[in-house]
Amino acid sequence: SIKDKICKIIQAQCGKKLPFT
């Protein structure tokens, strides 16, 4: 999914600030 792709692109931010974890 797009969320997963974005999450991989910015792993450092993933789950910290982004609404999609």
Curated annotation (Swiss-Prot):
PTM summary: Occurs in oxidized and reduced states which are thought to adopt a compact globular and linear structure, respectively.
Cysteine disulfide links: C7-C14
Modified-residue entries (Threonine amide), positions: T21
A GO term, aspect molecular function: toxin activity
This protein's UniProt keywords: Amidation, Disulfide bond, Toxin
Chain's role: Induces transient hyperalgesia and paw edema in mice. Probably exerts its effects via different pathways in an oxidation state-dependent way.
Family to which the UniProt record says this protein belongs: Belongs to the sylv/frat/paul family.
Protein name: Paulistine
Native organism: Polybia paulista
